[in-house]
Amino acid sequence: MTLIHMNIIMAFSMSLVGLLMYRSHLMSALLCLESMMLSLFILATLTVLNSHFTLANIMPIILLVFAACEAAIGLALLVMISNTYGTDYVQNLNLLQC
């Protein structure tokens, strides 16, 4: 395992620890999730490039599409919660029942 792989895995781990520590605010959780997705994208891209498996070239792009969808839904929830309650606490997500 190269130094680049170790750094990316460490970045993913730090993002996961940040997500577990700062889970009370939605904005902090979304930032940690975005950094996790970015490190997964870089790791997937490096893995595909190192393996020379041409059929898997689309996998990092699909991961980016899912990351963009996750970010859009998360920001929509953040705007909805902050407009309704004035804060971005995750505990307010339980109050959004339809």
From Swiss-Prot:
<dbReference type="GO" id="GO:0008137">
    <property type="term" value="F:NADH dehydrogenase (ubiquinone) activity"/>
</dbReference>
<comment type="function">
    <text>Core subunit of the mitochondrial membrane respiratory chain NADH dehydrogenase (Complex I) which catalyzes electron transfer from NADH through the respiratory chain, using ubiquinone as an electron acceptor. Part of the enzyme membrane arm which is embedded in the lipid bilayer and involved in proton translocation.</text>
</comment>
<keyword id="KW-0496">Mitochondrion</keyword>
<feature type="transmembrane region" description="Helical">
    <location>
        <begin position="1"/>
        <end position="21"/>
    </location>
</feature>
<keyword id="KW-0830">Ubiquinone</keyword>
<keyword id="KW-0999">Mitochondrion inner membrane</keyword>
<protein>
    <recommendedName>
        <fullName>NADH-ubiquinone oxidoreductase chain 4L</fullName>
        <ecNumber>7.1.1.2</ecNumber>
    </recommendedName>
</protein>
<keyword id="KW-0813">Transport</keyword>
<keyword id="KW-0520">NAD</keyword>
<dbReference type="GO" id="GO:0005743">
    <property type="term" value="C:mitochondrial inner membrane"/>
</dbReference>
<keyword id="KW-0812">Transmembrane</keyword>
<dbReference type="InterPro" id="IPR001133">
    <property type="entry name" value="NADH_UbQ_OxRdtase_chain4L/K"/>
</dbReference>
<dbReference type="GO" id="GO:0042773">
    <property type="term" value="P:ATP synthesis coupled electron transport"/>
</dbReference>
<keyword id="KW-1278">Translocase</keyword>
<keyword id="KW-0472">Membrane</keyword>
<feature type="transmembrane region" description="Helical">
    <location>
        <begin position="61"/>
        <end position="81"/>
    </location>
</feature>
<dbReference type="InterPro" id="IPR039428">
    <property type="entry name" value="NUOK/Mnh_C1-like"/>
</dbReference>
<feature type="transmembrane region" description="Helical">
    <location>
        <begin position="29"/>
        <end position="49"/>
    </location>
</feature>
<keyword id="KW-0249">Electron transport</keyword>
<dbReference type="GO" id="GO:0045271">
    <property type="term" value="C:respiratory chain complex I"/>
</dbReference>
<comment type="similarity">
    <text>Belongs to the complex I subunit 4L family.</text>
</comment>
<keyword id="KW-1133">Transmembrane helix</keyword>
<comment type="subunit">
    <text>Core subunit of respiratory chain NADH dehydrogenase (Complex I) which is composed of 45 different subunits.</text>
</comment>
<dbReference type="Pfam" id="PF00420">
    <property type="entry name" value="Oxidored_q2"/>
</dbReference>
<keyword id="KW-0679">Respiratory chain</keyword>
